[in-house]
Amino acid sequence: MNRNMWIVLSCVLYMIYICNGRDVLLYPPHKKTNKVIVKCNGYTNSTYSILYWMVGNNNTFVEQLNSDHYKEKKYNSTEKNEHMYKLRTDLIIYNITSEMEMTKLTCVLSDIYTPIKASIILNNLWSCLNTTQV
């Protein structure tokens, strides 16, 4: 292999390494309360990135919902650890109903690469854990 080929191969392998480090992690509550907070952390190597929530099967932005039940809290600071940036956003749900428990909640990390998502339906988690308040 010539020198240019090695440079290209090295760049490709580096990009694969960096892209594989991207992730979205959800931290849901273990029980139902009047105010439910679902935390989401996103990890990326890109300074040009955003982390946000989508609600329902139609993937509606929280800001587009005509509801006082859902609020999104974004944290402005991003922590940098080696090659990765950590972003955080919380989805706060007030006075949750049975229908809302069955709604798909999706956290999306959008950066210069393909967006990655993590989804949860709270009822599925709470049924499994069986720790819901009566």
UniProtKB/Swiss-Prot annotation:
Gene3D superfamilies xref list: Immunoglobulins
A Pfam cross-reference name: YLDV-IL18BP-like
Protein name: Uncharacterized protein C9
Taxonomic lineage: Viruses, Varidnaviria, Bamfordvirae, Nucleocytoviricota, Pokkesviricetes
